[in-house]
């Protein structure tokens, strides 16, 4: 079924290939929930990893779907160039319009954060939100490399070894994460830095 046609028919309130609009929307909602990879951790809230929401006309729908799926806070790892290219410059506003918190910590695709101190601060904020019982979704472009980096480091922060954290996140995501050896090394380095502060 043509995606553009679905969008136009939904705007007009009509049926899509003989299916009532409500059925199509409900099916889309179930698929959106599948795109959220939930990770249970040692927190009251839940962490989800995801690919970036669709931009442009679809952004509001995807933000609303995340809210209905139980997301309280969105953390984007996209760079400003990616936000522009993917038509996601309004993501913060749309998230807030849905009653969700929004944070941005740009990390270039397939790379690692530029600042260890800023990285630690972001992880502290996410940990605090999760500990308060909030559900947080972290996304990059495909929800693998940079998102996996955040998820693994959050688990390391709570006492898991880097290897076990990577294994768990990879198993839950259904694909090997993170994407690069540099990202994997960053998790090890983060664990060493964390241990030195205790």
Feature names for model-found ranges:
Residues 140:
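Short cysteine clusters
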Residues 143:
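Conserved G/P- and acidic residue-centered "switch" motifs that form tight phosphate/ATP-binding loops
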Residues 146:
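Conserved SAM/SAH-binding loop-helix junction
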């Amino acid at each position: 079924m043509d995606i553009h046609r679905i969008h136009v028919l939904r705007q007009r309130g009509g049926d899509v290939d003989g299916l009532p609009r409500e059925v199509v929307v409900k099916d889309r909602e179930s698929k959106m929930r599948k795109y959220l990879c939930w990770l249970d951790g040692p927190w009251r809230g839940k962490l989800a990893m995801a690919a970036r929401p669709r931009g442009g006309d679809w952004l509001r729908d995807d933000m609303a779907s995340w809210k209905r799926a139980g997301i309280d806070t969105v953390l984007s790892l996209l760079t400003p160039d990616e936000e522009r290219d993917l038509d996601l410059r309004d993501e913060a506003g749309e998230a807030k319009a849905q009653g969700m918190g929004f944070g941005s910590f740009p990390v270039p695709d397939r790379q690692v954060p530029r600042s260890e101190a800023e990285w630690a601060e972001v992880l502290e904020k996410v940990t605090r939100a999760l500990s308060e019982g909030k559900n947080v979704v972290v996304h990059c472009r495909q929800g693998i490399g940079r998102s996996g980096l955040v998820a693994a480091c959050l688990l390391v922060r709570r006492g898991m070894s880097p290897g076990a954290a990577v294994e768990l996140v990879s198993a839950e995501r259904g694909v090997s994460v993170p994407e690069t050896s540099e990202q994997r090394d960053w998790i090890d380095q983060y664990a060493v830095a964390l241990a030195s502060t205790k």
